[in-house]
């Protein structure tokens, strides 16, 4: 009888321990799910900010392109005016043959973004492991929830990986666009300075 009582006590203790571990494991999966959902929300906000920044860069580069077009017209007018005034100085052609001009405008992409962020894909079906994510012990609703939580965590982690790749691609694209904008801005400034000098010289000669 004493041995039976001891065995029952031991079994009850094992059951209590199993229940305790199941409760702790369930809470752990809930915390994991909350953390990855917060990370996903932060990732989405970051992608939205990058997209808005990309639109701003597009507008800036379009402005640089418009200045370039306007300067072509202004340089042509100055050249015609210079011929009329008997001046042969035409630094605009020399400027257009310079390395800086070719670098800024030679391969003008007109602000076209080379790559767009890929669509975030839910990978839960791909990541789900046949038979579930956990080894069953208590075989109750807690383990069902644990399995569901881990499946969601796995899917969100897959999404986060795609988000990270999208962010990296978008940042690389924007960095290249910023370099183009800087080159175009420098080229436009040089051309505006040259045009001002020519106009001043022609006015002075008049």
Curated annotation (Swiss-Prot):
List, in alphabetical order, the Gene Ontology terms for molecular function in this entry.
Answer: calcium-dependent protein binding; lipid binding; myosin binding; protein domain specific binding; SNAP receptor activity; SNARE binding; syntaxin-1 binding; transmembrane transporter binding
Indicate the impact reported for residue 117 to A. Inhibits interaction with ZDHHC13 and ZDHHC17
Q: Give the way it sits in the membrane.
A: Lipid-anchor
- Positions carrying Phosphothreonine are 138
Q: Which GO terms describe its cellular component?
A: actin cytoskeleton; axon; axonal growth cone; BLOC-1 complex; cell cortex; cytoplasm; cytoskeleton; endosome
- Give the residue ranges for region: Interaction with ZDHHC13 and ZDHHC17: 111-120
Q: What positions does the domain t-SNARE coiled-coil homology occupy?
A: 19-81, 140-202
Q: Which GO terms describe its biological process?
A: associative learning; axonogenesis; calcium ion-regulated exocytosis of neurotransmitter; endosomal transport; exocytosis; locomotory behavior; long-term memory; long-term synaptic potentiation
Lipidation annotated as S-palmitoyl cysteine: which positions?
85, 88, 90, 92
Instruction: Tell me the segments the record calls region Disordered.
Output: 1-23
Annotated Pfam families:
SNAP-25 (PF00835)
Keyword field contains Cell membrane: yes
Residue ranges for the region (Interaction with CENPF) are: 1-75
> Site positions for (Microbial infection) Cleavage, renumbered to this chain?
180-181, 197-198
This protein's UniProt keywords: Cell membrane, Coiled coil, Cytoplasm, Lipoprotein, Membrane, Palmitate, Phosphoprotein, Repeat, Synapse, Synaptosome
Enumerate the CDD domains for this protein.
SNARE_SNAP25C, SNARE_SNAP25N
Q: In its UniProt entry, what is this protein called? A: Synaptosomal-associated protein 25
Query: Can you name the source organism?
Result: Rattus norvegicus (Rat)
